[in-house]
Amino acid sequence: MEFKLIAEYFDKLEKISSRLQLTALLTDLFKKADKNVIDKVVYLIQGKLWPDFLGYPELGVGEKLLIKAISIAVNVKEEVVEEQLKVVGDLGEVAMRLKKTPQSASILSFLGAQSNEGLTVEETYESLTKIALASGEGSRDIKIRSLAGLLKKASPLEAKYIVRFVDGRLRVGIGDATIMDALSTAFTGSTSFRPLIERAYNLRADLGNIAKIIAQQGVEALKDIKPQVGIPIRPMLAERMSDPAEILAKVGGEALVDYKYDGERAQIHKKDKEVYIFSRRLENITRMYPDVVEYVREYINANEVIIEGEIVAVDPESNEIRPFQELMHRKRKNDINEAIKEYPVNVYLFDLMLYEDADYTMKPLPERRKKLEEVIKPNDKLHIAHHIYTNNVDKLMEFFYDAISNGAEGVMVKSVAKDSIYQAGSRGFLWIKLKRDYQSEMADSVDLVVVGAFYGRGKRGGKLSSLLMAAYDPETDTFKTVCKVASGFSDAELDELQKKLMEIKLDKKDPRVDSQLEPDIWVEPKYVAEIIGAEITLSPEHTCCKDMVSKGAGLSVRFPRFIRWRDDKSIEDATTPKEIYEMYKMKLRKKEEEQHTDEA
């Protein structure tokens, strides 16, 4: 399959913002894609060489190396590339322009660098893989030579997208939801098989692999997909509510209630002595927790199992729960053995999704929990999450306050009904989180995605100091703006913010962003931040829940304040408009109750 085809479609995709048009173009590309390399086509669209869970290195090519490779490929001095970059602001565009110059074309032809055969997807992928895997002494030269060789053979348009891919700025604005719609339409003629594709992807979070199965075996083959050790399952997510009586009613009157620990959610896979640990974002974090790997080998009584829990920092002396920030300190340590001693951890397990080749995701929670309890040998490092079963609101609240006093964030209230399956990759009311109140503030924080930024005034003049934040809408695969956040940042965080944002600056709005506001700069949706505020309120400026409450108005966070970056969350894990709408309704109900009490 020619890489030229992908480059041409990337060029078309970049020029449109309608999701329907994006899906139609992508459908067309998948129809033309070689069945043997469609997995690689999907990875390239996602802006990666392989799924994150493999833990392989990223390309590791900085701007200076890219400039050098381009200069070698087109036979000009590095200064020429740098000058063009100042004018254009996009190395991909620079590479394309320089490839079009008569000097570049004639010299390369004379050198025999341009053959009659164009680049193939396989050849391009192989070269990019070589660049990513190069390490140690001489790796810098290998990366430069490999990339320069690839760019020499590439057409101007191919060079543009190869450079953008390597630079981490592909900018085609396509999310996984759009890819799944396009796969369904390309291979079945409609989106009716999208739920089956999504179910398979949720159980085996490798969209390239799913695409290859569809292309080679047909979409019906996905019905046989089940969890597999080594490939993470997309995590089940909880809804949020603040009224304990309503929560119990929502889950059917009876619930399993777990502590909600302030740690790192981890999905742990074991097959014989092989252990893998994946983060909430499905990244391979095994090397960060060699102590947990040993605990699993020693205390989990199963040959093949996938379990889920929270890795929590504990005090080395008292074994009491420590804040999440201590895990972050541990991750920053270069000496992992020293980190283990200084920041020990316990693991609090709460679910089981695979046991000895049997898929447990479709079994009710009580059955999953029973099996989880059976596979853990008695020990003081791996624990079942502290929990109760209850149908009583008072007992729920007593347990909630017990959780808070013991260092937890709150509790997770979980349905124990017959339909209490593990909803991989979905957010629903089978699990509901109840977290502590923030006094006069919102009942809960929200996790929002940075989509743009504004320059400050006064002492913050010339600095990007206000962020345009958005919620993720899974139904439309778009980001709806919620608020502008300017408070809560320390001076050090503000300084770090400048670099962070300029690295992901875009020339125009990302196609997935739905905004009425025009920030000073647009950025690629990449970072998730936890935000707290006074309340959820109506706003004519923002697009989140637009027209749902009042015509012409959306919902916004009043007096928003930055709490922390949520590096453990992907942008698709951000708070949804539906959740924000529910929080707004909670506020209205609370005010009505207070008014009723005052009148009484």
UniProtKB/Swiss-Prot annotation:
Q: Which HAMAP family match?
A: DNA_ligase
The UniProt family comment states: Belongs to the ATP-dependent DNA ligase family.
Report the EC number(s), separated by commas if there are several. 6.5.1.1
* Key words, A-Z: ATP-binding, Cell cycle, Cell division, DNA damage, DNA recombination, DNA repair, DNA replication, Ligase, Magnesium, Metal-binding, Nucleotide-binding
The catalytic site is made up of: 260 (n6-amp-lysine intermediate)
Asked if the record carries the keyword Signal, the reply is no
Protein name, entry field: DNA ligase
Which PROSITE patterns does this chain map to? DNA_LIGASE_A1, DNA_LIGASE_A2, DNA_LIGASE_A3
Q: What class of enzyme is it?
A: ligase
Q: Per its record, what are the GO molecular function terms? A: ATP binding; DNA binding; DNA ligase (ATP) activity; metal ion binding
Positions contributing to ATP binding: 258, 265, 280, 310, 350, 427, 433
- Which transformation does this protein catalyse, written as a reaction? ATP + (deoxyribonucleotide)n-3'-hydroxyl + 5'-phospho-(deoxyribonucleotide)m = (deoxyribonucleotide)n+m + AMP + diphosphate
NCBIfam families given in the database record:
dnl1
